[in-house]
């Protein structure tokens, strides 16, 4: 049996093993990022504004005169009041939801034959925040706001009533209603997280 000759590639592999070349390559990445500004936000002292399309707490849009004219036909079979929820108790949100136990919707028939929603509860402990209920709503009543601080000490407080949902939507519409629909609220906040983006040409 003859002596095996080592090729140039084998010599380089041995040299890399002795000098820890791969280790130094990995360490260079670490050292390069060590000098960069961290992207972490010191929550709760510092808070970022979520984008308008953020999937936070749900809200109920109310009858305020800004709804489309096509919804005026609802007057024939629904009893509604100004500044109250647009919900028509069609149960489409509950049907579309992967967790239908999340909703508790009740409506009553009034003496004049019209229907009135008396209860709309959402148990956020069951919610996946997928937004399927918002897409399914035929009257554009349901929306998702930018409210994300929903932690509570009691399970009972995780159930949102219709009044809570109305307040969330009114507040969201006043704060962000005229804002353009963008992924990031502004370039400053995006740069704070990811640095200045330079396009390669």
From Swiss-Prot:
GO terms for cellular component: plasma membrane. Its EC number is 7.1.1.-. [4Fe-4S] cluster 2 binds at residues 97, 127, 130, 133. It is a peripheral membrane protein. Residues 78-107, 116-147 form the 4Fe-4S ferredoxin-type domain. It catalyses: a quinone + NADH + 5 H(+)(in) = a quinol + NAD(+) + 4 H(+)(out). Keywords: 4Fe-4S, Cell inner membrane, Cell membrane, Iron, Iron-sulfur, Membrane, Metal-binding, NAD, Quinone, Repeat, Translocase, Ubiquinone. It is an enzyme of class 7 (translocase). The keyword Cell membrane applies. It is found in: Cell inner membrane. [4Fe-4S] cluster 1 binds at residues 87, 90, 93, 137. InterPro entries: 4Fe4S_Fe-S-bd, 4Fe4S_Fe_S_CS, NADH_quinone_OxRdtase_chainI. NDH-1 is composed of 14 different subunits. Subunits NuoA, H, J, K, L, M, N constitute the membrane sector of the complex. NDH-1 shuttles electrons from NADH, via FMN and iron-sulfur (Fe-S) centers, to quinones in the respiratory chain. The immediate electron acceptor for the enzyme in this species is believed to be ubiquinone. Couples the redox reaction to proton translocation (for every two electrons transferred, four hydrogen ions are translocated across the cytoplasmic membrane), and thus conserves the redox energy in a proton gradient. Belongs to the complex I 23 kDa subunit family. This is NADH-quinone oxidoreductase subunit I. The gene is nuoI.
